[in-house]
Amino acid sequence: MIKSELVQTIANRNPHLFLRDVENIVNAIFDEITEALAQGNRVELRGFGAFSVKNRPARTGRNPRTGESVHVEEKWVPFFKTGKELRERLNADE
């Protein structure tokens, strides 16, 4: 599912809301999560999971084409840990 499909699904479930309003709400949620992560904060959605950032230290990598050693800078990467309820639902016997 892509973002536009998510917006459409939410709009279909809530016919009292305009599609544009649903799109604005979804964008606002993603913007807030992104901003919190950019500030180094953790975003927890109980039962669903938690978004956080982790540091990947600088390292020496290798160019796969030439075999030459390449310095890879340290960077921050997004990380998602699933919540217990989500894991249980995904692994439930149906």
Swiss-Prot record:
The keyword Transcription belongs to this UniProt entry's keyword annotation: yes
Any GO BP annotation: DNA recombination
CDD domains with a match to the protein in the record: IHF_B
Database matches in SMART domains: BHL
GO cellular component: chromosome; cytosol
Record keyword Cell cycle present: no
InterPro entries: Hist_DNA-bd, Histone-like_DNA-bd_CS, IHF-like_DNA-bd_dom_sf, IHF_beta
PROSITE patterns reported for this sequence: HISTONE_LIKE
One GO molecular-function entry: DNA binding
Entry keyword set: DNA recombination, DNA-binding, Transcription, Transcription regulation, Translation regulation
Pfam families assigned to the protein according to its UniProt record, in alphabetical order: Bac_DNA_binding
Identification of the protein by name: Integration host factor subunit beta
Organism: Chelativorans sp. (strain BNC1)
